[in-house]
Amino acid sequence: MRPGAPDLPGAPDRPGEPDRPTVTAAGEELTALVRSAQRGDRMAVQELLDLLTPYVGRLCGPIALQDGPDATQEALIAIFRNIGRLREPAALFGWARVIAVREAVRLARAGARTVADPLDEVPARGDPQLAADVRDVLERLSPAHRAVLVLRDLEGLDEHAVSALLGVPEPTVRTRLFRARRNFRKAWGR
C-alpha cells in the first residue's frame, strides 16, 4: 500500500492502478458489505459510511479548500444515493474517488466566484506552520489547478487516471499540472 493511501479493504495499492476485484478476505468482506448496503441494510450503509468518510474527506479537502467539508458531504450523499448502480463492489473506492473529485471541483469553482474566508481547519501532519503555508498557497490556485496538483502530487495518480477523473484530455492534464506547479512555486517564493 502506498504512503497516504487509505488503509481500507479493496482500495488500490498503487497510484493510477485501476480498482479490480480482489480475492482476499478483506476484498470479499467489502463485496459483501457493498451488496448488503445495496439491498438497504442500514448497518452495512453505516459501515460503508465509516469507511468512506475519511477517504472522501482527504480527497475533497485539498481541492475544495474551505468548502472541503461541504464537498465531502455532497460526495457522500451522491455515493449513497447511487450505491445501487455500482456493479462491481471491488471498484468502490475508484468509483467514490470519481464522485468526490467531481463534487470538490464543482464546489471549488462555485466558491471561486465568491470571496473566500481564510481556512481555519485542515488536518496537518508535522509542522503546523508549514501546513498553514501550503494551505495559503493552495488557496491562490484555481480549482482546476488545485485538482490536478492534488490528484497527481498528493494522491499519486498518473496522467491517464487524472484525465479520466476530471474528464479532460491528457495534454490538458499535463498543461494544468505544469501551470499549477509553476504557480505554486511562484506563490511559495522559491
Q: What are these model-derived regions, one by one?
A:
Residues 38-46, 57-74:
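Short, charged helix-capping/linker segments at alpha-helix termini
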Residues 148-152:
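A short pre-motif secondary-structure segment
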Residues 81-88, 98-119, 127, 179:
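Arg/Lys-rich amphipathic alpha helix in sigma70-family domain 2
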Residues 70, 84-98, 170:
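Short, aromatic/basic-enriched loop-to-helix "N-cap" motif that marks the start
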Residues 19, 24-30, 106, 110-136, ...:
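Internal acidic/polar
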Residues 38-39, 62-63, 74-91, 110-114:
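Sigma70-family region 2
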